[in-house]
């Protein structure tokens, strides 16, 4: 039976001849609709379309792979019914070359196919983030040096920029502004035009009227939101004064003042608004009567004072200057903004030169080059399609765009230029409420523009279709989400009105659950009081009153996170103890909840995820956190970076203590305390110098440190940073040391990555340790952490801890959204120069001669707009988080003072159905929004009662359950539960009465035989070589007892006798050279020889290893057809590690059937693979000695290994391995599988 489509889904699948915008809510089946439309086009009886005539653009490579798979599955299903349909069979063949891809990949194809239209080397490659950041830093340094050296008017403008925005000590702040602004400008379709237009806005003419400018319009909008909030505050006071005896005069005065404030909301003209607000005066209040309620009088007087202060602040901030003075301020900014624009253009030119020299392009270049190829600019400046664009218009019958709400301006320009106009052929699907990538320059206004202009009527050229039926979530989840967002989401904040059209409609079908089971249920709201835990009674009073330093604040933050994590852990355990069940579509039945059904979502994972992971693990809950971070926080990297900092400047106490405490010098805590006591006023370094005069063990350690440091400092002066870094690894023995630590292989790999970064750094004009340390610090900030992603399959039985952004597109039966009390990040609002794609540049006004600065009126406008858009994005992030839930939604957040917060939420909800934009804008966290939205709900009565709040109840179909927690109780509860009073338990036992029973139980346990004993001896992990040996052993009838053989450990180097390299060691050397060879360089005998010499110099190879490498055989490989194909590929990967999960019965064939679900992780390293247009080519090198006539035997021996490599590679890349080879270095044979 086929899928039962709704009428709206059918319309989206079958409508032709229009541009279609499908607004698809969370869980509405948009991907299924998109796939069905493609299948519908392919199988159309009257006008069938070949799959390679469609362009399908997805947001990620994973989404593209999934789309391709879904289309393939659908085609195969149809073919099963129509096996004779040759055209349909051909579509499966065409599917491999169909353009189902990300926009970046499509643009890259355009550039590679048309590079000759650009001044571009056809052998270009895409630089990684580190490489391009280094080039940008190098270009900016060189540019600044050139600007300082100039002797013309450009230098004057540049020096004004440095004085205004460079920072207090150097010009670093200006360099940061340049790089940040350059990145933004390059995200726009026509960056130079944008810059020119923006600078011209500061060139104000005599007829310029600020009061009608776009900046004035934005500021007036912001002030109206502010005034509406002030008015509501006044109306609360008016309401409190009603019928208050003795305060009638107050009531009339407050009413009059509220009316005057309300009048401001009607003015859309700057001057009218200014005149009215300037005229507002707060006259002296009349005397209160003798019978007046003093509490009410004091409360309303405080409200009035706050209102007066707010009105005064608005007057002084925006209306103290005349429009002429504002005009002069903007005019004064023109020359400095012009100098900034010129600097950006000069930087762009220099950065392009650097990239050209390296033969690389960056990710922004891909889209810009594609746009350049696809467009032609005529004399009037109009943009027209080029011949290439017209070719694509002809080629693509329809253009599909998934996740359309996340498109940016340049992507929209590209897709528009290749789309047909008659008949229109665009199909765009997305949900603007899930647009959460503005930080990547995604622009939801692109979606809004079409949403507001497209028609719901069929047959229109531009048509929209609404899919708002949710097939994912239970009714309890949907009603709670609707209840929250109808209160807080609006056109101004959230950027969409949450109307009846936008709300989620229940469409899922959940069967009736079994009796005595727990399913679904009310949405839970867990509020945690973040009060400070009281000290133990025996602690001294003065210790309680000490001021908190940074470390204590950090500990408090960790405590707060721990408390939330423990609350979450407790709730997860309750789900299992209460027989909570979920509906499993695969088995079409209910089953007990599993750990894999649960996800914990966090807005930010950097600090939170590790704490949650630890707490859940300690609670006995298997958990996994895929943060994509952690590289710079690993022990080995922190230690080495600290060491480099100390070598550069030993006067830094924190890095120095880290190095002294590390295994490199192994100072004990007692010794470090002794050092500190040497001289409390001096630095640690000075204390070490003083301690080195001592005649004890500490003195010896201190002297050794100083001697070693001096030696390293001398070497650092003349050695390149990469060589010096490798020298440190070897000299300290730290590289070998970390190998013996847990995850030693990973730790060594981390150190090698740092070495590679140093190598990249040395290829630039930067030199020296100081600059390298600065570069690493910049890398942390600019490119984020470099943690390697960990892969967990969807069926792994663990609770996932992930960011809300990573959860987008996923769904889970149980969703726990934690950290809801965490404050929003608003740091972007406090940059010296703000920027906005519509409003332009917003600089600080700086008078560096008088040493004063303040936000310009332009900056105030942009600041408000950025805040508005940032909070709109946060609202959509919250929407994404809540809509991941299928059956159970649990919300967790902390607040410093819950009663105070509840009163704040009640004030926000007291006067109107919807929470005001003022209260939304002034909300500090998700919890402020949720609290204000739900506080009037009937189920929130216990919370209102707790806070002493009286508020009219609101009826709603949603169901809520509130639980209050206290930080102190949560922290102490765990400590209490960890202690077991064994004595009391023993006392309670009647040993005589139960002796025989205990005896029997002891005997039963001693004689117990575990039924799955063999599983205990199965290895958790095997190498590919071990798997090959086990499977090949079947021919000699080996059984699984071989898994119990003793592991033969490698003899340590210091115990080995020197006797030359073994065959295995020679093979390792050969593989190392094949891994490290630069394939872009000369690969003749001389070229290979020179590269090997360089590897020895950099201590990648030893002299002994280098002598054993047969360069003739390496050259021979590259002369083969296989080697030539590898060199011509644009994507070659070498030494790729992998893990793959296999059933134990696939490896140990004699295991019984009950071991089918016992899995073993198989690990290995793929020597090499490269990509061609139609798939991947896998190569494994072998250095074995091969007897004459034994080639086929070799091929058979490694068959299992090659198949495992192929399977792993397809899993990793999502691409088909089309060819598999072994290359035998011994005789140059190529064995194909």
From Swiss-Prot:
Q: Organism's domain of life?
A: Bacteria
UvrD-like helicase C-terminal domain sequence ranges? 518-809
Sections of the chain in a coiled coil = none
Q: Which GO terms describe its cellular component?
A: cytosol; DNA helicase complex
- Known EC number(s)? 3.1.-.-, 5.6.2.4
Q: Where is this region: Disordered?
A: 533-555
The GO biological-process annotations, alphabetized, read as:
double-strand break repair via homologous recombination
Keyword annotations: ATP-binding, DNA damage, DNA repair, DNA-binding, Exonuclease, Helicase, Hydrolase, Isomerase, Nuclease, Nucleotide-binding
Q: Which GO terms describe its molecular function?
A: 3'-5' DNA helicase activity; 3'-5' exonuclease activity; ATP binding; ATP hydrolysis activity; double-stranded DNA binding
Where along this sequence does the record place binding of ATP? 24-31
Entry cofactors: Mg(2+)
Similarity comment text for this entry:
Belongs to the helicase family. AddA subfamily.
Under the subunit heading, UniProt states: Heterodimer of AddA and AddB/RexB.
Protein name per the record: ATP-dependent helicase/nuclease subunit A
Organism whose genome encodes this protein: Thermoanaerobacter sp. (strain X514)
Lineage of the species this protein comes from: Bacteria, Bacillati, Bacillota, Clostridia, Thermoanaerobacterales
